[in-house]
Amino acid sequence: MATAASNPYSILSSSSLVHADSAVMQQGSPFRNPQKLLQSDYLQGIPSNGHPLGHHWVTSLSDANPWSSLASSPLDQQDIKPGREDLQLGAIIHHRSPHVSHHSPHNNHPNTWGASPVHNSSGQPINVYSQPGFTVSGMLDHGGLTPPPPSGTTQSLHPVLREATDHGDLGSHHCHDHSDEETPTSDELEQFAKLFKQRRIKLGFTQADVGLALGTLYGNVFSQTTICRFEALQLSFKNMCKLKPLLNKWLEEADSSTGSPTSIDKIAAQGRKRKKRTSIEVSVKGVLETHFLKCPKPAALEISSLADSLQLEKEVVRVWFCNRRQKEKRMTPPGDPQQHEIYSHSVKTDTSCNEL
C-alpha cells in the first residue's frame, strides 16, 4: 500500500494502457480496412504451386504496419527478383539463380514483401516462380539437368548476346571463305624462287630491272633488295605469297616476249637493262694488243678500219683501247718509261698513229 501511495502514477498508467489496448482491440475486431480485406480475399484464391502464401503478404501493407517504409530500404533491394531474361540466361549457362534457390535471411521479416503483388497489363497476377524452365526450388521444369531446346535459346537471349552470336556465325563463315583461297606452300615458294632466278638470269635482267618493271606494269615498285631477298627466301611467308603472283606475271610476259624485238625493247625500256659483257677472242685480243703497242691512242679513222677488219663494233674497239691505257698506267710505276714507248724505239711506228 505504501508503494502504491508513494507512486500514484504507476497504477494510473498501467490501467490506462490496458483500457487503451482493449479499446483498440474492440474497435479493430469488427472493422477491417477495405483494401486489406479485398487483397487478403484475393490472395487466398491465387494458386501458389503448392506453397501457401504467408501472412506477411497481407500484414505488410503500407497502411497496416508503420514499418512498411522498410520496403524501400537497401535490405529490400537485395531481394529484388531477377527479370525474365536473366532467369532464362541462367538456364542456358547451367547456373541456378541465387535469388531463386536460396532464401534471403531477410525473408523472415514481415516487411520484406511490403509491395503488393505485381500485375500485368491484363490484370492477372504474375507469379515470380512461374518463369519458363524454373520451379520454386530453382530446378528446371523439363528435367533439371538438360538445357531448354536450342530453338528457343536464341530468341530468349538478350539482344546484345543474340547479336554477338550472329556475328560469331558470320566470322566463322568468313574464316571458312579465307581458308578456301589458294595459298602456296613453302615448298612451292621455294621452287618458284629458284625457277624465277634461273629464268631472270637467262633472259639477262637484273634484280633492279625486275623491281622497276613491276612498278611500271603493276604500279608496285620494288627495290633490288626485295627481289634479292625473295630469291634467297629471306622474306616472310606473307610477303612471299604477295610477291609471287606479281613475279609470275612478269616472268610469263618476259618469256612470251622472247624472240620478239619489240616486246624485248618494251621490257628493257621499263627497267635498266644490263648490257651484256663483251667477250673478245684470244686471237682478236692479240691483234689489238699489237696495235696498242704501236699506237696507244689511235684516231677515229684507225679505230673504224680496225673494227671492220676484226668484225667488231667501233664502240667496242674504242672502249678496249681506253681500258688498255688505264691498265698500262696502273702497271707502270711513276717515272719509268711505259711499254709502248720502249716498243716504239725498237720498232718503227706507223706514221698515221700520232699522239693526241
Swiss-Prot record:
One of the protein's GO biological processes: regulation of transcription by RNA polymerase II
Skewed-composition ranges (Basic and acidic residues): 160-181
PROSITE patterns, per database record: HOMEOBOX_1, HOMEOBOX_2, POU_1, POU_2, POU_3
InterPro entries: HD, Homeobox_CS, Homeodomain-like_sf, Lambda_DNA-bd_dom_sf, POU, POU_dom, POU_domain_TF, TF_POU_3
DNA-binding positions: 273-332
GO CC terms: nucleus
Keyword set includes Cell division: no
GO molecular function: DNA-binding transcription factor activity, RNA polymerase II-specific; RNA polymerase II cis-regulatory region sequence-specific DNA binding
Protein localization: Nucleus
PANTHER family reported for this sequence: POU DOMAIN (PTHR11636), POU DOMAIN, CLASS 3, TRANSCRIPTION FACTOR 4 (PTHR11636:SF83)
Family recorded in the similarity comment: Belongs to the POU transcription factor family. Class-3 subfamily.
Name the record gives this protein: POU domain, class 3, transcription factor 4-B
